[in-house]
Amino acid sequence: GLDADQADWLIQNKAALDGLDCRYIMSHLSSAEVTDDPTNVAQLAAFNELRSWFPGMPASLANSAGSMLSPDFHFQMTRPGSALYGVHPGDIPTGKLAPVVRWQARIMQVRRAKAGDRVGYGGTHQLGRDSTIATIGVGYADGYSRMLGGKAQVLIGSQTAPVVGEVSMDSMTVDVTDVDAAHLRPGTVELLHDGYDLSHIAGDAETISYEILTKLGTRPKRHYLNS
């Protein structure tokens, strides 16, 4: 990539491109996720000025968020990335954009616990009532953030249940006291679902959706549907 001074030099010394097969002029928006950020308009103006020195050459500027700002940012090619996975790009209305990633795990054990018992490493969660606690076979080694302990929720059948205690390396615990017992076997648990999507889990983990996806390790099996 070139900074502004280098681009100016190149414009004045086009002979430096002799022998190169240049196919596209490309740049990348730094703040496309924020629709009213003035940087977007400034970058577009600078990009158009650069394009004017290379007439006829195709151009590409917009990532997922940039492609939703306005057609002015589209040019000959857009470069959607996270939108292909249904990731919501910042504060931009997404219309028909829908999440395509679901993350499931299984219940390994269900046990009863007494009011006052503590759950997980460090005993950070103390039960306020007699409870049913399920141990789920996923942990931070699978990419499930430790920040989600005591914050996140999972879906079991048609009912949600809170994650309680610390997230461990290979497991975590969920309070299933209010979940219909019929849903606990075979015990499929949805960690990402329509009611708790990437934007929600990222918010609870105090990170961004991109990090949630890229931290999914090799242990979770991938199943590609309707591909």
Question: Which residues does each predicted region cover?
Answer:
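Active-site loop/helix belt of alpha/beta enzymes
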Residues: 1-106, 110-115
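C-terminal accessory subdomain/extension
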Residues: 112-227
